């Protein structure tokens, strides 16, 4: 049986805490201590810049961001610069990976399936990573792979404030706009419904037989996660 573990945070999580969690779970996955794991959450406002990103794509000073309550963090994922914040669904994939290109395509297809269910004609782009509605980006994707195990993932705009994207050149792409489910479908689905649809779509695209969801409010609650897995 090919199982998927889903860690679902019901409260907003600081980016640094989620990053530390990914590293710990990545080590466990490399050792085959855990199954492939999908983390679903919302972040407090933060702008992240990928390892090959250009800081020139940040249009505000770090002091200005701080005054607005937005953190700025350099990270080791692919991609350039992006924004995370409340009401945006972020998913981190701690998966064994055989081929990078095929893996990214499956991530994109997983999100596209969900958006189609909401009546949004989303698609992938041959030229740029992520998920698009015409020339508007609705989902950013940035992946890192180490020892054949992935981390980082996607950020799907649900009904989040899009104004902070004007503080950056999203993903380093000039003249490209961002959008959200709310903007495209004229309604805002409950976040729990979006999460459920994402889980089902990931199961389908990656060929899992089943999935198990564990709900948490903070990263500290995961201290006994390894012990819990031993009982599965």
UniProtKB/Swiss-Prot annotation:
Q: Which domain of life is it from?
A: Bacteria
One GO term of the cellular component aspect? cytoplasm
The compartments listed are: Cytoplasm
Limits of the BPL/LPL catalytic domain = 32-219
- Pathway the protein takes part in: Protein modification; protein lipoylation via endogenous pathway; protein N(6)-(lipoyl)lysine from octanoyl-[acyl-carrier-protein]: step 1/2
Quote the EC number. Answer: 2.3.1.181
Q: Enumerate the UniProt keywords alphabetically.
A: Acyltransferase, Cytoplasm, Transferase
The entry marks the following residues as binding substrate, namely: 77-84, 140-142, 153-155
Query: GO biological process: any one?
Result: protein modification process
Give one Pfam family. LplA-B_cat
Q: Name one GO molecular function term.
A: lipoyl(octanoyl) transferase activity
**Which spans are transmembrane here?**
none
Record's catalysed reaction(s)? octanoyl-[ACP] + L-lysyl-[protein] = N(6)-octanoyl-L-lysyl-[protein] + holo-[ACP] + H(+)
- Major location, coarse class? cytoplasm
| InterPro entries linked to this entry | aa-tRNA-synth_II/BPL/LPL, BPL_LPL_catalytic, Octanoyltransferase, Octanoyltransferase_CS
| Catalytic residues of the enzyme | 171 (acyl-thioester intermediate)
Which residues are tagged with the site Lowers pKa of active site Cys? 137
**Similarity annotation:** Belongs to the LipB family.
NCBIfam families recorded: lipB, PRK14345.1
Entry protein name: Octanoyltransferase
Give the gene name: lipB
